[in-house]
């Protein structure tokens, strides 16, 4: 089995500067940084466009290590031939180390962005840096899956295949209330709109991070753990919160509040596989996942039950044949 250190050695990390980027609201930023990683070699058609591109998209945690796609790449029975495809991972708009409130130091003055902006950010980068004819496949998880679904209906001819895990087409009522509450708690801090980063904002991140990430604890752990074990999980969230910026967190949370694409998914042309983890507490399979069968024309929806520990993606081995058949 290839280790995570081996795969990180295979990945090449770099940055690219977009001369400018225009948001949907008309605001423009100049000298916009895009952090990205690649693996493999691109293949080109007669027009010089890349034909073997596979895009891996981040989860809410926004790191490749936390993305379930790494298990596909790390698997000794790798479902893709590494020699045949060119893999690209792009840190999204709004997330360090790409253009974000914290990286630009714009904080609350950073332009309000949408999932459509995040799609255009990645698409502009790919067109400028790695001009492609069509993306062979996008593999995405959680918030990265939301973004990829938006991409699929905005630019339906851009991709052939789409695989999304732990996604929904609209934020369910209880999750909407949580996201809205986080927004209101942050905005209630009188220092949020100050030009100087106040210490009270740093202290605020700890309870907010617990509230925002509690849904990342799988059902098998949350429902069957005693309070001491749950306190251990929360301690881990405390450690993570020390490295999170409240403005970055605020803007990503805003995306969730406004997410509802139910009436747009009929425009998706990509052959789509939706994987619903029934052990994920944030999603209800019948409410959030199953409707994709009717919402996306060429789609397959499968339930999986992935028992796992905190910060583990679980064992996908029994589903590898499904993925292989779908992606190849």
List the predicted regions and their residue ranges.
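Alpha/beta-hydrolase
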Residues: 183-275, 283
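Catalytic active-site module of serine/aspartate enzymes centered on a nucleophile-bearing elbow/loop
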Residues: 297-328
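Catalytic-loop region of hydrolases
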Residues: 1-53
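N-terminal cap/lid subdomain of alpha/beta-hydrolase-fold enzymes
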Residues: 37-102
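Conserved loop-alpha-helix segment in the C-terminal half of the alpha/beta-hydrolase fold
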Residues: 271-300
């Amino acid at each position: 089995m290839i280790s995570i250190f081996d795969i990180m050695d295979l990945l090449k990390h770099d940055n690219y500067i977009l001369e400018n980027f225009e948001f949907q609201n008309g605001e423009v930023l100049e000298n916009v940084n895009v952090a990205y990683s690649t693996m493999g070699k691109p293949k080109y058609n007669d027009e010089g466009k890349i034909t073997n591109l596979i895009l891996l998209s981040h989860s809410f945690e926004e790191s490749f290590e936390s993305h379930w796609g790494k298990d596909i790449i790390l698997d000794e029975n790798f479902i893709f031939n590494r020699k045949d495809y060119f893999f690209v991972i792009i840190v999204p708009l709004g997330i360090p180390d790409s253009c974000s409130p914290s990286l630009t130091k714009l904080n609350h003055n950073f332009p309000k962005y949408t999932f459509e902006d995040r799609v255009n950010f990645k698409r502009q980068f790919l067109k400028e840096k790695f001009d492609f004819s069509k993306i062979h496949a996008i593999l995405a998880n959680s918030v990265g899956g939301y973004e990829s679904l938006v991409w699929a209906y905005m630019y339906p001819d851009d991709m052939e295949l789409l695989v999304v895990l732990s996604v929904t087409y609209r934020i369910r009522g209880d999750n909407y209330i949580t996201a809205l509450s986080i927004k209101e708690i942050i905005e209630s801090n009188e220092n949020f709109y100050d030009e100087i980063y106040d210490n009270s904002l740093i202290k605020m991140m700890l309870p907010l991070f617990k509230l925002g990430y509690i849904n990342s604890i799988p059902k098998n752990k949350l429902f069957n753990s005693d309070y001491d074990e749950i306190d251990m999980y929360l301690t881990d969230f405390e450690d993570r919160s020390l490295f999170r910026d409240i403005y970055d967190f605020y803007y990503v949370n805003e995306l969730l509040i406004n997410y509802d694409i139910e009436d747009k998914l009929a425009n998706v042309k990509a052959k789509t596989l939706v994987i619903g983890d029934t052990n994920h507490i944030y999603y209800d399979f019948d409410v959030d996942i199953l409707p994709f069968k009717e919402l996306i024309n060429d789609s397959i929806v499968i339930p999986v039950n992935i028992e796992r520990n905190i910060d583990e993606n679980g064992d996908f081995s029994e589903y590898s044949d499904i993925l292989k058949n779908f992606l190849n």
